[in-house]
């Protein structure tokens, strides 16, 4: 039964397609961040949110891997000792299949790629803040009649310090979530406005060049604001914008950015789908798993529809066997598992501890190797015992009782004044040798012959070692 459910579960888990992020621009937008500082703050929060979710997924997969190793060690150890492992073990183990690792690796790579874009945009928004500046006036003095010999005094640039970065906009006071990521991010275009302003007497009257006080003032500005419009004339009372243009910092397209945000959101959702093996909902809520419970635990046909009383029975079986909370699952599965003894390699020797004391990947990996080796040895020893004694042992002979029931290769012996049916090892050996001779003879007659001999041990080890390497 355990093998059957394990096989069905593995088929189900491997049939699940890998979850990948897709790209499609959102239709709803957040409130626009109107300044570079606000946009940089928004991207910073978005970056930290993504990093936190990636770290959670990596940690979850890492812990799942350790739990899977423990489950496999416990399963092999129980099997080697003649016991049975519950169907929960098989399912939880299968849930740590390569498909889950593929989901993590693929979507983590997508997220890291998108984070590179976010970090680059954030840096450029801050860069715009650092180049936002206004020059002090460059002046041209009057020389009495005209300006051709008037003196020019050069001004300098002063970086504009903003205080808006000390606070957040209402849109960005809350932490981002999946709803936030399902929208366009409302990011301001990365442009830098350049303006050249001209004034006569700095708005103090007409300029006749009659005296050195009749100055023409020229000012340069760079910032992220609207570039404004140029004036057709220079009014003596106002500063006129003589030149204005936008400098495009990068050639980003808003639809491309929005599509990237969608891919980012989908990749994060895919990471969230990695199950937490300490939560019973990771498997009891799975429709395919419930179908398996109905088939294997309740002996229902695989085509049984899970409705009504059948579904109620399945839900009760899930609750009884696996619990409905992490604490119940711990009591029913993890605590007994952690109490099991496991042998592992350490400092060139084999040590034995409870599974709960094995915390490193090296300890768990070597413990799995030891468990596999022991399981193979037990199987081979059992096979040799069967071949040697013709499938009979002292225990099976004793169970037959005395008298006519005690037949070769068993025989009656007297121990402590009582008759017992015990295995006659010489007779058992003769029976086994005769069986081998008969098998060889059948082979010469064209019938099936077992030619593996001692090689069967190596043949049996191959799939086990492959399973060990693929874990």
UniProtKB/Swiss-Prot annotation:
Biased composition (Polar residues): 158-168
Keyword Hydrolase found: no
Signal peptide span: 1-21
Superkingdom of the organism of origin: Eukaryota
TM segment ranges: none
Protein localization: Cell membrane
Region listing for Disordered, in residue ranges: 158-183, 204-232, 432-454
Keywords noted in UniProt: Cell membrane, Disulfide bond, Glycoprotein, GPI-anchor, Lipoprotein, Membrane, Signal, Trypanosomiasis
Protein name: Variant surface glycoprotein ILTAT 1.1BC
Organism expressing this protein natively: Trypanosoma brucei brucei
